[in-house]
Design a protein with these regions (language model features):
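Acidic, metal/ion-coordinating pockets
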Residues: 1-359
Length: 359
């Protein structure tokens, strides 16, 4: 049994425009066409869906840090071989609660599964799949939801909407003119290469923050609950820095408590670069898989950190346990039409520095 995991899936404005034909119809399949054979080689594929499908009326992606992608991305991912999308990430409320709910609806409409966000408190906050008698539980959690910038705070009584490892950050209260100016600047300004490296998006002081303990306890209870129902528990964790070269203290803290809490594997994303894959006790850890789909040099971008590469991770499962893994290196490049697409990398010299990051 082979279960594969992609890095973060984002669609930038240039990619969207490059996928519109002369009749105004969108087709995102060219972005994934060259990596489709790799995805087809797995029995089940999980993608990190770091955008929303909130609809045209909510406004499509136009800034570097706020995402909403046309619905046509979902059938393209299904066509490429993706089966399950993790939806707990810092962009899940980029278009508010309505956008998050519509995203789930569209995922289901297109024959895909999801985990990480929920429509109702009655829904399970993890997904269990039975693969020929081996039950695997998939959980997805995020460190936050960009609430400081998008201003969305989960209403009281709706904490089921997304799986969080800590409380949401308080929104920044700025005068209206500053908010408008900031939004306009994000649209017209070009990214500054090298200006956005962060070791962790959560301060190291929060490792000992008592406010987080309730969230962590609920997460660990969920892991134990899933462990009662499944043979293998896989945590898809959205946490970390940005373009960082090592795992930050807060995210390492999460790795520690999740592995000690009984998860069999942790699949990390969010860093927008690749980070080490290793065994931590009885838990397999992939710290960060990188960018599976995005536009190099566009939006929030840093040079010199191999951000255009990602690791397509495949876990091999036999006898109801993880028995090994394989990594295929992928790269986001621009084709002859200027469209940023994802391709497999087969050149050993090019692969070597990425493999070094994964050690």
């Amino acid at each position: 049994m082979k279960i594969a995991f992609t890095g973060d899936i984002l669609i930038y404005e240039s990619q969207d425009k490059g996928c519109i034909d002369k009749n105004g119809k969108r087709d995102y399949r060219p972005i994934f066409e060259q990596v489709k054979p790799l995805l087809d080689g797995a029995d089940y594929v999980i993608g990190s869906f770091e955008t929303t499908a909130a609809g045209a009326e909510a406004g499509y992606t136009h800034a570097a840090t706020s995402f909403n992608t046309p619905d046509e991305l979902l059938p393209a991912l299904k066509w490429a071989g993706v089966d399950l999308l993790t939806t707990a990430n810092n962009h899940c409320f980029d278009r508010g609660e309505a956008g998050m709910r519509r995203t789930i609806d569209k995922i289901v409409e297109n024959g895909l599964e999801y985990t990480g966000t929920r429509l109702s408190g009655k829904d399970s906050n993890y997904l269990i799949k039975d693969f020929d008698g081996t039950k695997v539980a998939f959980l997805a959690y995020t460190y936050g939801t960009n609430s400081r910038s998008n201003g969305y705070i989960i209403p009281k009584g709706k904490d089921y909407l997304v799986n969080l490892t800590r409380p949401q950050d308080e929104p920044l209260h700025r005068p209206l003119w500053k908010r408008v100016a900031s939004k306009l600047l994000s649209i017209v300004s070009k990214p500054k290469a090298g200006s956005g490296i962060q070791e962790d998006c959560v301060n190291a002081m929060e490792v000992a923050n008592g406010r987080n303990e309730l969230y962590e306890a609920k997460m660990l209870d969920t892991i134990r609950e899933a462990k009662q129902e499944a043979d293998i528990v896989i945590m898809c964790l959205h946490s970390g820095g940005q373009f960082n070269s090592k795992v930050g203290a807060y995210t390492q803290h999460l790795f520690d408590i999740i592995s000690e809490g009984g998860a069999d594997a942790i699949i990390g994303n969010h860093a927008h670069t690749t980070l080490p894959i290793y065994q931590q006790g009885n838990c397999f850890v992939a710290s960060a898989l990188g960018n599976f789909s995005f536009a190099p040099g566009e939006g929030y971008w840093v040079d010199g950190v191999e951000a255009e590469y990602s690791a397509l991770l495949t876990l091999n499962i036999a006898d109801k346990t993880i028995v090994g893994h394989k990594v295929d290196i992928c790269k986001c490049v621009r084709n002859e039409m200027g469209l940023a697409i994802t391709v497999p990398v087969n050149n050993e010299q090019e692969i070597e520095p990425i493999n070094n990051r994964l050690k």
